[in-house]
Structure formats: structure tokens, C-alpha cells
Amino acid sequence: MMLTIIMLSKIFMSSLISMILTIYLNNIFNSPSMLLIYLISYSIYMSLMMFTMCSMNSLLILMILIVFLSGMLIMFSYFISLINEPLKLKMKPFIQTLFLIIITMKIYNKLSQNEHYFNYFKNIDLMYLYMKMNSTLFFIMILMLIITLILMTKITYIEKKTLRKKK
């Protein structure tokens, strides 16, 4: 069971690296919906990695995943209110992404065979922040999500939206 979880985390790690590379290589910032898909996959990846590191705090990991995904949904509704153009998926960036996924999986497989690099995942400071999180930080995150949701609804009801493209 643990071996399959480690293999899944390797796949998620390589896909995360390839997603980050595609953001910078293919100018994904032009499409906010693609950027949102990357952010959602990152939050799912973070919660899976935290579960593999410390499976005893599964309730805390679930709460963090819910906070991340609700934040992503708030951002998604904000972006949807600003987008006039539909998402146009081109085949060339998809093939490049697939190629980068294959390359990063091969590189990650070679690096993970050496146990020196395997200890790197135990020392990630960001993981320590989320695993040993206190309740005030968690409530601040929830409060920020509520404030963002209120501001997003205020922005969508503005009549003269300056952020939209003019026809």
C-alpha cells in the first residue's frame, strides 16, 4: 500500500513539475481557466503528499484540502466573471506538456533510486508549516477566503467593469 502511494506521489510530482514548466514555456497566463486547473491540481498534490508524509493527521489534511479547493472555487468564479473568450485548447502545447511529463518522470525515477535524494522530501519546510499548523493560521485562511468571496461578489456586480475587454 505504501509503495503504491509513493509511486502515485512520484507521478504527481512529475506532473506538477511539467505543469510549472508549461506555465512558463507556453504563456498559460493568457488563459485564467488553465491557470486555475493548475492551482487545483497543485492543492490536490499538496494534500496527497502531506498524507504520505504523516497519515495520522488525516483530518487536518482534509480540512486544508477543503480550504484550498474552496479558495480555488472562489477564484474560479471570479475569473469566469471576467472572461469573455472561451478556452481554446491547442494541440501543440498539449504535446509539449506530454513530452515534459515523460522527461520529468524519467529524471525523477533516476533521482529517486538514489536514497540521498529521497530524504529531501522529509525536510520540506512548507510541509512542516501545514503539518504543524496552529488553529489561528487556519482561521486566518478561512477568514481570507470569506473576505475574498465578498469582494468577488462586489466586483461582479459593478456596472462599468474596467477589467473586461471592450467590444
Swiss-Prot record:
The chain crosses the membrane at residues 5-25, 34-54, 60-80, 138-158. The keyword Transmembrane applies. It is a multi-pass membrane protein. Its EC number is 7.1.1.2. The keyword Cell division does not apply. It is an enzyme of class 7 (translocase). It is found in: Mitochondrion membrane. It catalyses: a ubiquinone + NADH + 5 H(+)(in) = a ubiquinol + NAD(+) + 4 H(+)(out). Its main location: mitochondrion. It comes from the Eukaryota. GO terms for molecular function: NADH dehydrogenase (ubiquinone) activity. GO terms for cellular component: mitochondrial membrane. Keywords: Electron transport, Membrane, Mitochondrion, NAD, Respiratory chain, Translocase, Transmembrane, Transmembrane helix, Transport, Ubiquinone. Belongs to the complex I subunit 6 family. Core subunit of the mitochondrial membrane respiratory chain NADH dehydrogenase (Complex I) that is believed to belong to the minimal assembly required for catalysis. Complex I functions in the transfer of electrons from NADH to the respiratory chain. The immediate electron acceptor for the enzyme is believed to be ubiquinone. This is NADH-ubiquinone oxidoreductase chain 6. It comes from Apis mellifera ligustica (Common honeybee). The lineage of its organism: Eukaryota, Metazoa, Ecdysozoa, Arthropoda, Hexapoda. The gene is ND6.
